Amino acid sequence: MRALDYLPPVDVTFGDFLRAVITAETDHDPVDEEGIRRAWMEAFRLRGILPDDAPSFSEEALCWPTLGDALPIGKLPYGGPLGLSYEEREQTHQILREFIDQNRAFLRLAPVGEDVGEYQIPSFHPLVRVNRAGSIRWELAVEIVQTGKGRPNRGTSFLMRGGTTLIVSTHSTAGGAVEDRMFPRFVIAKPLDGPPGEARAELQRAHLEELGYMPDGDPARYRINFALLHGGD
């Protein structure tokens, strides 16, 4: 369950899930004496499921990269046992908006234009992390989503979604909490633009064409004739 917070907000792949699991387990238990992370990796490797964007197939490479503490966000409300109140959510939303607006490139958000809409924040929620040694860390998981038009090399445009999962922590990479200063610890992106966005657009176009949803596809090709069920022997 911890791994779900380490997934990109859109177009999740099995490779993304493996990276999320390895990252979550490394956060929870850096030593991993039982070999849980190695078992996950071996199970995925045997099934030929490998992440496309990892530098190599090692624990260090599969973990999402952590960020330094040079880009503080400011003070965010922690909330109580029942989460954030309405006022705290409004305050958090405003602080996040200001941070995102000032750091769009850092968060790998595409520039707004004719084919790309403005970003939205569909959800954010506080997390209290307790690792195996009993250390506690407060974090905030934020989903940022953009909608744009995919324009592959051939065919017409179609809607695509991109975005970033931002995990904000009270701990810097040095491991110490700093009062009133919180930092982006992970930026897990599925951008709309650049080579990754273009590759996803081509894959999505091919999928839609196969389903017959593109102008050069044939929807009837995949239509099932249920009348044939009554024509058996």
Identify the meaning behind each predicted range.
Residues 1-6, 16-18, 22-233:
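Non-catalytic terminal regions of proteins
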Residues 11-15:
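Flexible, glycine/charged-enriched surface loops at secondary-structure junctions
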